[in-house]
Amino acid sequence: MKPLIVNCHTGEDLYVEGVERMRKSAEELGYEVYTEEMSSKGSWTANCAFKPKFLTSCVARFGRPLVWVDADAVLYKPLEHLECPYIEFAVAWDPLLPFKSFASGVVYLAATPASHRILEEWGDACNKAVRGKSREWDQVTLYKVWKKMKDPPVTKILPQGYVKIFDHPWRGDELQVEYVRHYQFSRQIKRKAKAS
C-alpha cells in the first residue's frame, strides 16, 4: 500500500495554490492526499513546530503509513525509497552539512509503535521549543529526538532528490534524481510581509 501524503498549511494564496499543485502531481503518480488549512501560530518556526501535532492527528485518523510533503512541493517520480516494508521512518539530510539536522520537507512514518514514539517525542520537543521561545527549527528538533532515542525506528536516510530546492544546485556526488522539488514559498511570503 502506498503511504497517504499529508500536509497542513497556513492558507496564504501561495500555499493554497501550491498545495493543489502538489496534490495534482501526487495523484498523477497514484498517491492519495489529505491536506488541512490551519491558522498561523504567529511565526514560521511555530508553524513548522505544529507539524508533529498535525501528523499525530493523521496517525489517529487514518491508521496507515503517512508521508508529509511540504505544500510548496511537486512530486516528479514515485517515492520508491518508501516502498520497503521494513522502514519505519524516513527523512533526508544535506550531505554537505554536518549531521546535526534533517531536512523535513518530506518525512515518512510507518504505522508502527516505533514511528509513533518518535512522532510523540518530536511533538513534545517542538512544544518545549516554542514555549521557550526557541528559534530552533522542527527539523533540528527531529534530528535531536531521533539521535537520543534508545530504540529508534528502522530509519532510511533519503537521497537529496526528495528535498531538492528549485533554485539550489545539487549537493555532493550523490545520484541526481529528483523525486520531489520544493519551491520555498515561505521565503516569498516573508519578503511580501516585509515589503508591506
Predicted ranges, named:
Residues 3, 104-105, 179:
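Residue-level detector of short, conserved catalytic/binding motifs and their immediate flanks
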Residues 116-196:
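Catalytic core and acceptor-binding pocket of nucleotide-sugar-dependent glycosyltransferases
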Residues 49-102, 106-116:
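GT-A fold catalytic core of metal-dependent nucleotide-sugar glycosyltransferases
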Residues 34-36, 67-70, 91, 154-159:
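A structural signal for short, well-ordered beta-strand segments and their strand-loop junctions
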Residues 2-5, 87-89, 155:
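Hydrophobic beta-strand segments of well-ordered beta-sheets in folded domains
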Residues 1-64, 113, 149-151, 183-196:
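N-terminal anchoring/stem segment of glycosyltransferases
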Residues 19-22, 75-80, 161-164:
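Short, polar loop motifs at secondary-structure junctions
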